[in-house]
């Protein structure tokens, strides 16, 4: 019986002794007076108000007044004295977030309230007893015994009670693992399994509690309309066939009225519900005692309760008083009222029903007593279809052929089809309610002792009551009476009430108030559970239900609960509502067992339950039994409940706030990750499994914000959530000075990764210089077999500016590091022009310029990009370069065949490059590059002059490039080069720098370009011209990236070559293979 919320007012209090405790409650630094209205710390995660050592707020002077602990003075800010910590622990009250005051605070002043703490018997045992015993025991248990028989009924009850006992053992382990927060099973599950499981199971538990309220209200109305006041029915059946529909309509009307009345009572004040709790409990106890007293009485004085049978069929004793066809009156024989029900007249010659005419009417005792031997007749099941006759086994009957069942005949018929699994679903709600003690944990003297003891004792007691009642019902009551759900054969009396002593009204009135009180407590507890979930903030759309009245009463949650409860009342059938809430409670219990099993198997250091009588096998058995019972009850209800829980889980995972509750699922994930990492090969992957595992190198500005966020957009387009992505960056400085900036930078990167939907890991390094930091990232990023094989970085656009934090020297060194590590390198040039994830290219080309083969990565990257919606409509074109002595036609055929085997569709074009003379532009471009390099080395320029000189040379190179096609004259000699330096300025520099010899400037004017540089520049210029001619309008151009020179003296020239190679192109991706990445033609 799942009334899992018996609400008791929780007052702020101080557990102190004597005057010292009273004084502590008045001091502002006491544990009770710490502001608990804002349970959300700086990380945004609500925490339980617990005595964590970093939350102790006491003035530093009080720690070391005598200077005895001056040695530890520096640690006092974060680590308190042991005496202070123990004081906090001793005065800790386990009031957690989500716990609200259930009674109005008549005066708003904070004062000490010495509320009596409850022990095991009052605080746990009796509430569990009250919540477990209830409506199913009074209204359906006799019917279950009649349909399933004693043996199968015993099996049903044993399975359900075993399930709850195993769940109680798991719950006891969880509840005794530390101070128990008030809040019940939701807090235990959510803090053990994490916010996703906690929210999903919490909502299922809430729905179960809400539908439980509907079930109790329906039970209350059924008792009222069937056994207390049948004349109060609004809808009357015109025929016997319409009685069931009329009853359902009456249940809907009266149930809705009862729900509205109960909701008003709960809204006005829950204190009235709490005051009536003892009355409801007394009703339950008296009813149970009356049942046992009635059983004992049947042993020596069975009650006289006749049941009329026609043949072997049970008759509904409503419109006749004599169980006979005819009776003798004044020496004459006359027909009875029963005759007139089956015949068309009262005369002996009237036409009667064929079955009535051929079978005799007999009368048996409905409750023959314990000593009657009826137990053997009730031992086995008697399942039947809907509308079947309730027949007594072993009684002879004359069958009739092709009998039609005319309406109006007073037979007792079954209203629903009965079978084993259906009875399990109807019965299971009667064993729920084991969480009542944990919901009162905030008001217990010793919750870690009371919850296991009280809960397990309550389950043992109720299991004994249920099992003994099954045996006693089977031994005392006739089978046809047991199968008579509504007591029609007993003139409409409650079957279990007829057994009770001293009067049937003890059971009728007791069960009425018991179910009424259970409904009130469900409507009290369910809104508070929803309010606790809403206040946790894990489900954003439920946050409105976290608000309530000024005193904390959950008004909006109560309104939603009443609406959901109304849907259950509109179903109107107790037998249809019971399996629904069975699903939700079974799911809740399943995850309680899962939480205990996971924590035990992981052996986490904080898993130290005080309750020792648990084992992971018991929890696993309980979880399996819950899952089995779900599908036994109703496989489609089970799938629907699991679908709801799964949707809630994914919603919380997708939209919910990030919570860190130290849950077991995180530990399980870590164990699974460790196991998977140990299985991953440390060597290179197989050819067929190779994919780029990317380390993205980001640059940060002075505010620790990402300079080029579109680099992450490009990463998500390239990876599409598959494989490994590590986003790294370097901060210059020492870790002691920069750890705050490092944390802020990591938060900025993570938020940008989330915005760009880049799934991966963030790794930030603080190093004395950027060069070493980048090298450390390339060497150490990743773990075990999960290491990157590709480095993605942005081209340093302003590399010619000497004060650029990521200078060209760092860039070239990073290129060398990736080459040494045999890793691929991707350099995105003009990264700010790359598309964001929201953009779409409706047309265009991705051009691949395949100059040298370094593993086939150039062809793999466009294929991966085109899987993303941004690049999906772009065509792929592959260009390769042919020299004069190459057969370009055969090259094109071979390349097309190669792509065919690679299963890549792309246009192929072979571009011929004629070896002509080195142009004047190339010679001058090389000269400008070398002159600039020499000048910057030889002249000690100021920062502003150096920048201006670099810009002037850059401008002249650009102007030279625009007029290169019109030049036909021979390469200019060095003396024709126009320099911005005058002779006077050079003399002034010479006097300023005495150590600079005059030969340096003389060499500057007689400089001749190096022939290898001229050849490289010639290649760059020629290739750039060819690429511009073919791919200037391409959406993306992929090019082989030349390797850096072996000598570091040519690093700056290398940067200039790359600049010339890619000049004039919008989006360029320079690709340098590491030698290990491959693309294969094999499957």
From Swiss-Prot:
Keyword Cell membrane: yes
Disordered: annotated span: 1-55
Glycosylated position list: 312, 331, 344, 360
Record GO biological process: cellular response to glucose stimulus; chloride transmembrane transport; potassium ion import across plasma membrane; potassium ion transmembrane transport
PTM field: Glycosylation at Asn-331 and Asn-344 is required for proper trafficking to the cell surface, and augments protein stability.
Region (Scissor helix): 664-680
Residue ranges annotated as Cytoplasmic topological domain: 1-119, 173-196, 441-450, 532-554, 599-612, 652-1083
Family the UniProt entry places it in: Belongs to the SLC12A transporter family. K/Cl co-transporter subfamily.
Subunit note: Homodimer; adopts a domain-swap conformation at the scissor helices connecting the transmembrane domain and C-terminal domain. Heterodimer with K-Cl cotransporter SLC12A5.
Disease: Defects in Slc12a7 are a cause of deafness due to the progressive degeneration of outer and inner hair cells in the cochlea and of neurons in the cochlear ganglion, leading to the loss of the organ of Corti.
Protein name (Swiss-Prot/TrEMBL): Solute carrier family 12 member 7
UniProt organism field: Mus musculus
Lineage: Eukaryota, Metazoa, Chordata, Craniata, Vertebrata
Gene: Slc12a7
């Amino acid at each position: 019986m799942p009334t899992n919320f018996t609400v008791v007012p929780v007052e702020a209090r101080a557990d102190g002794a004597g005057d010292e405790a009273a004084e502590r409650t008045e001091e502002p630094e006491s544990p009770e007076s710490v502001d608990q209205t804002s349970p959300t710390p700086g990380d945004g995660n609500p925490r339980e108000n617990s005595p964590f050592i970093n939350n102790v707020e006491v003035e530093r002077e009080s720690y070391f007044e005598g200077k005895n602990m001056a040695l530890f003075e520096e640690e006092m800010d974060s680590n308190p004295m042991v005496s202070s910590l123990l004081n906090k622990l001793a005065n800790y009250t386990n009031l957690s977030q989500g716990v609200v005051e259930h009674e109005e605070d008549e005066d708003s002043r904070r004062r000490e309230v010495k509320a009596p703490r409850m022990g095991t018997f009052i605080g746990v045992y009796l509430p569990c007893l009250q919540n477990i015993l209830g409506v199913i025991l009074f209204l359906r248990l006799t019917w279950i015994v009649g349909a399933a028989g004693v043996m199968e009924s015993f099996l049903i009850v044993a399975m359900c009670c075993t399930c709850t006992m195993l769940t109680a053992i798991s719950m006891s382990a969880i509840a005794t693992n530390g101070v128990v927060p008030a809040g019940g099973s939701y807090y235990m599950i959510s803090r053990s399994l994490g916010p996703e499981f906690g929210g999903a199971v919490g909502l299922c538990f809430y729905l179960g509690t809400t539908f439980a309220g509907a079930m109790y209200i329906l039970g209350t109305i059924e008792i009222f309309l069937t056994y207390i006041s049948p004349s109060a029915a609004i809808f009357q059946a015109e025929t016997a066939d319409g009685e069931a529909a009329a009853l359902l309509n009456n249940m809907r009307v009266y149930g809705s009225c009862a729900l509205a009345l109960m909701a008003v009572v709960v809204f006005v004040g829950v204190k009235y519900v709490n005051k009536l709790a003892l009355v409801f409990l007394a009703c339950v106890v008296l009813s149970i005692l009356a049942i046992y007293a009635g059983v004992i009485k049947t042993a020596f004085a069975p009650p006289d309760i006749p049941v009329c049978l026609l043949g072997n069929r049970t008759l509904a004793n409503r419109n006749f008083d004599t169980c006979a066809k005819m009776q003798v009156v004044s020496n004459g024989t006359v027909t009875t009222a029963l005759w007139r029900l089956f015949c068309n007249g009262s005369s002996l010659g009237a036409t009667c029903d064929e079955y009535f005419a051929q079978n005799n009417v007999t009368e048996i005792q409905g409750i023959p007593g314990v000593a009657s031997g009826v137990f053997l007749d009730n031992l086995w099941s008697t399942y039947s279809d809907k509308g079947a006759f309730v027949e007594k086994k072993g009684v002879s009957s004359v069958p009739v052929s092709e009998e039609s069942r005319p309406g109006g005949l007073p037979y007792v018929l079954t209203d629903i089809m009965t079978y084993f699994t259906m009875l399990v679903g109807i019965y299971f709600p009667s064993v729920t309610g084991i969480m009542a003690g944990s919901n009162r944990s905030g008001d217990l003297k010793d919750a870690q002792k009371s919850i296991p003891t009280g809960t397990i004792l309550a389950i043992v007691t109720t299991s004994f009551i249920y099992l003994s009642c099954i045996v006693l019902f089977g031994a005392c009551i006739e089978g046809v009476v047991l199968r008579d759900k509504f007591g029609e054969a007993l003139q409409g009396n409650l079957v279990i009430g007829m057994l009770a002593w001293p009067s049937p009204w003890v059971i009728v009135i007791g069960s009425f108030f018991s179910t009424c009180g259970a409904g009130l407590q469900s409507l009290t507890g369910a809104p508070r559970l929803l309010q606790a979930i809403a206040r946790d903030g894990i489900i954003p759309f439920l946050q409105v239900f976290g608000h309530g009245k000024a005193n904390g009463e959950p008004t909006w949650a109560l309104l939603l609960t009443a609406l959901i409860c109304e849907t259950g009342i509109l179903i109107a059938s107790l037998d249809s509502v019971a399996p629904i809430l069975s699903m939700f409670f079974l799911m809740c219990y399943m995850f309680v067992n899962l939480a205990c099993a996971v924590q035990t198997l992981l052996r986490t250091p904080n898993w130290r339950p005080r309750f020792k009588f648990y084992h992971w096998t018991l929890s696993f058995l309980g979880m399996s039994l819950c899952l089995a019972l779900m599908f036994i009850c109703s496989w489609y209800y089970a799938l629907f409940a699991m679908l709801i829980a799964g949707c809630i889980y994914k919603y919380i995972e997708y939209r919910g706030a990030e919570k860190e509750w130290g849950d077991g699922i995180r530990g399980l994930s870590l164990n699974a990750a460790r196991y998977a990492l140990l299985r991953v090969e440390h060597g290179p992957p197989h050819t067929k499994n190779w994919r780029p595992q990317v380390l993205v190198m980001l640059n940060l500005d002075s505010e620790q914000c990402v300079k080029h966020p579109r680099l992450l957009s490009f990463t998500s387009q390239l990876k599409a959530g598959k494989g490994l992505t590590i986003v790294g960056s370097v901060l210059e400085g020492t870790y002691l000075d920069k750890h705050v900036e490092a944390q802020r930078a990591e938060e900025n990167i993570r938020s940008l990764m989330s915005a760009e939907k880049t799934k991966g890991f963030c790794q930030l390094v603080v190093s004395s210089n950027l060069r070493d930091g980048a090298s450390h990232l390339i060497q150490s990023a990743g773990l075990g077999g999960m290491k990157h094989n590709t480095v993605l970085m942005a081209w340093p656009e302003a590399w010619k500016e000497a004060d650029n934090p990521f200078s060209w020297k760092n860039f070239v060194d990073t290129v060398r590091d990736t080459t040494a590590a045999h890793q691929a390198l991707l350099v995105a040039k003009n990264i700010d022009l790359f598309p964001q994830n929201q953009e779409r290219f409706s047309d265009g080309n991705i051009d691949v310029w395949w100059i040298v083969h370094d593993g086939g990565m150039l062809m793999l990257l466009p294929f991966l990009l085109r899987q993303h919606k941004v690049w999906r409509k772009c065509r792929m074109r592959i260009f390769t370069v042919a020299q004069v002595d190459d057969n370009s036609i055969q090259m094109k055929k071979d390349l097309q065949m190669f792509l065919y085997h690679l299963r890549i569709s792309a246009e192929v074009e072979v571009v011929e490059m004629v070896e002509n003379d080195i142009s004047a532009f190339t010679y001058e471009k090389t000269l400008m590059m070398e002159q600039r390099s020499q000048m910057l080395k030889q002249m000690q320029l100021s920062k502003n002059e150096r920048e201006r000189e670099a810009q002037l040379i850059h401008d002249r190179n650009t102007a030279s490039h625009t007029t290169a096609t019109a030049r036909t004259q021979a390469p200019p000699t060095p003396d024709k080069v126009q320099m911005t330096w005058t002779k006077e300025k050079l003399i002034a520099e010479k006097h300023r720098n005495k150590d600079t010899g005059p030969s340096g400037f003389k060499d500057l004017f007689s400089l001749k370009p190096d022939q290898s540089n001229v050849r490289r520049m010639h290649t760059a210029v020629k290739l750039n011209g060819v690429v511009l001619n073919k791919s200037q309008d391409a959406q993306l151009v992929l090019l082989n990236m030349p390797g850096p020179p072996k000598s570091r003296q040519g690093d700056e020239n290398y940067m200039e070559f790359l600049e010339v190679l890619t000049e004039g192109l919008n989006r360029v991706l320079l690709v340098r293979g590491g030698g290990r990445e491959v693309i294969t033609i094999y499957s």
